[in-house]
Amino acid sequence: YYNGLKFHRVIPDFMIQGGCPNGVGNGSPGYRFEDECSPKARHGKAGMLSMANAGPGTNGSQFFITHTATDWLDGKHTVFGEVVSDADQAVVDAIRQGDVIQSAVVEGEVSALLASQAERISQWNAILNA
């Protein structure tokens, strides 16, 4: 889904945002899902990967990665990953508006997560494939 999409919003010292199928920030995959904010997953440092949204329950495909701590986003945007090394954060910090995602790859053991969300994933794929 993400391969070939642009980083359509880049704000220095704040974040980079991508995942819009239209490339300008107004698109979605055709479905929305609820927030899954947790006090254990916070925006307390650079490199937090979170869902971009337009308010509660409006998550779709857009995401952002922070350049710095952004505590004011806690409870408003679901954190679902993080940049794990300084070298990777340097890549995030070098991304400019309009840069294209060449390939998105999920690393690590995700089979239990995918199994627990199988019904939702099936529904989302039906929308994407329609």
What are the residue ranges of the model-derived segments?
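Cyclophilin-like peptidyl-prolyl cis-trans isomerases
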Residues: 1-130
